[in-house]
């Protein structure tokens, strides 16, 4: 069975989850897997020399468990969407995987039909992060001492990627971002279906 897998990566608080949920509402036969659902327990998270918990690294995530969820979906795509979705005009099962380190994890490299990466400038990212509540809470200096430097490091690693990633300005409106990605996905699905 044909499937269509979308990766939505990007900076923390860049709009990944919002975009994924908006797409899921409009795309038939669509499921979402969020990388944030696969964080290891706090007791298993490393602490750096500054005392910061190292959440913004692949080692903080149970990627094997996430890959298992992806594999389960691939083996039985569309099962979570229900029978009505399977009968839709665009019956290709769609999986959206969203997270901050998707494109830095090699086992996912060959899965993407479309890849998107949301960027947000430093000041806006810091402002957005300050409005969110995390468990455990961000200690003072965490954004500048860990979160942003890790984003820059992982973003630099992405320079070696050989497949196409569409970079999106995360400061654009939710509606604009949705419209751009939705239209792009529709065109790609039509190409895949030979329409």
Curated annotation (Swiss-Prot):
Residue ranges of the TM segments: none
Entry keyword Flavoprotein:
no
Q: What class of enzyme is it?
A: transferase
One of the record's GO molecular function terms: ribosylnicotinamide kinase activity
> Organism source for this protein?
Rattus norvegicus
InterPro entries reported in the protein's UniProt record:
P-loop_NTPase
Any one Gene Ontology cellular component term annotated for this protein: cytoplasm
Reply yes or no: does the keyword Transmembrane apply.
no
Name the PANTHER family on file: URIDINE KINASE
Pathway per its UniProt entry is:
Cofactor biosynthesis; NAD(+) biosynthesis
Q: How does it assemble?
A: Monomer.
- Residue sites binding substrate per the record: 36-39, 55-56, 129, 134-135
Q: What is its EC number?
A: 2.7.1.22, 2.7.1.173
Instruction: Please report the name of this protein according to its UniProt entry.
Output: Nicotinamide riboside kinase 1
Q: What is known about what this protein does? A: Catalyzes the phosphorylation of nicotinamide riboside (NR) and nicotinic acid riboside (NaR) to form nicotinamide mononucleotide (NMN) and nicotinic acid mononucleotide (NaMN).
- Sequence positions that bind Mg(2+): 17, 36
Q: Which family is annotated?
A: Belongs to the uridine kinase family. NRK subfamily.
By its UniProt entry, which CDD domains does this protein fall under? Answer: NRK1 (cd02024)
Catalytically driven reaction(s) = beta-nicotinamide D-riboside + ATP = beta-nicotinamide D-ribonucleotide + ADP + H(+); beta-D-ribosylnicotinate + ATP = nicotinate beta-D-ribonucleotide + ADP + H(+)
- Where is the secretion signal located? none
Q: A GO BP term, please?
A: NAD biosynthetic process
